[in-house]
């Protein structure tokens, strides 16, 4: 299931969803927290963060399938390093989903005018920012190591 899509490694396709969705959803969640009129749309942020977590899981599984297919001894250490870093991204994605769910539960109101207490708002903002920054930093780190694994030698050979 996570191996190939139309004869190509699924990992090469799925990682783009992670690299786009995880940072996007952290920004969207912060925006929904900051804008009172948008808070009623927080369930969409929760759903988006769930999709980002699912994409992260698919990237992790497809990466393991791809690593199993590669038998180049020169590539193995770089791929192993990438896999070692990438295995933790799912925890950041799940944390972002859980925080968006908690924030939605904290900030939802029964009436149409979204009002919240300052402590709830401050807690929501701090949680959202902290997890979002951590998730984005780790996404960058994983993406950078993956890009280096795939492209470093190819690009180096064009500089000669």
Protein language model annotation of sequence segments:
Residues 1-160:
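Polytopic transmembrane helical bundles with strong interfacial aromatic enrichment
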